[in-house]
From Swiss-Prot:
One Pfam family in the UniProt entry: Peptidase_S24
Main EC class the enzyme belongs to: hydrolase
Quaternary structure and partners: Homodimer.
UniProtKB keywords: Autocatalytic cleavage, DNA damage, DNA repair, DNA replication, DNA-binding, Hydrolase, Repressor, SOS response, Transcription, Transcription regulation
Upper lineage: Bacteria, Bacillati, Bacillota, Bacilli, Bacillales
NCBIfam families the record matches: lexA
PANTHER family assigned to the protein according to its UniProt record, in alphabetical order: LEXA REPRESSOR, LEXA REPRESSOR-RELATED
DNA-binding region: 28-48
Name of protein: LexA repressor
Record GO biological process: DNA repair; DNA replication; negative regulation of DNA-templated transcription; proteolysis; SOS response
């Protein structure tokens, strides 16, 4: 068999480093960024060749499902403790914007944290929820449900078809969406649709 190329070795080493550091393999996009390949098809080609060499094994029905076939790496069964949560659109936690109802990617999280298949993540921009510890650029973990108690943080769709992250309060004749920022005022609506309850926040420290 032809000798493994330097680029293939670079990709293999990067996958190993990511699995050791994070407990799960990188995405195709992350591999490309790490080794300087802009084309995802080129990355897939290198992964195919690594798989033919018996160095990795992939489950193409699942995102990021790459197993390194060496004794010092976690097996695919051990990696099954990770759940791949869909990241859906982008919700503004300041001025609401129309929600984009498509899955942008799948994000790996420990299964014991997620606890349910009925969850998704949303990226947040704006500072209206800073007092609740939700900052600009965070991703919120949301459990899909159509009801919530007063004071809970939810993803709510307004009458105008816009989505926002706020605390919800059902008052006598209106629904109040309350920001967690002393400089911002509450928003009032006749009706809103609850798209889910926020159960966690993910933040990357740069």
């Amino acid at each position: 068999m032809k000798k493994m190329s330097a680029r293939q070795q670079q990709i293999l080493d990067f996958i190993k480093d990511e699995v050791r550091a994070k407990g799960y393999p990188p995405s195709v996009r992350e591999i490309g960024e790490a080794v300087g390949l802009a084309s995802s098809s080129t990355v897939h080609g290198h992964l195919d060749r690594l798989e033919k060499r018996g160095l990795i094994r992939r489950d193409k029905t699942k995102p990021r499902a790459i197993e390194i076939l060496t004794d010092d790496m976690p097996t695919m069964e051990e990696q099954e403790s990770v759940m791949y949560v869909p990241v859906i659109g982008k919700v503004t936690a300041g001025t609401p914007i129309t929600a984009i109802e498509n899955v942008e990617e799948h994000f790996p999280l420990p299964a014991h944290i997620v606890g349910s298949d009925n969850v998704y993540m949303l990226s947040v921009s704006g500072d209206s929820m800073i007092n609740a510890g939700i900052l600009d650029g965070d991703r919120v973990l949301v459990r899909q449900q159509s009801t919530a108690d007063n004071g809970e943080i939810v993803v709510a769709m307004t009458e105008e078809g816009e989505a926002t992250v706020k605390r919800i309060y059902k008052e006598a004749s209106k629904v109040r969406l309350q920001p967690e920022n002393d400089e911002l005022e509450a928003m009032y609506f006749d009706n809103v649709s609850i798209l889910g309850k926020v159960i966690g926040v993910y933040r990357t420290i740069h």
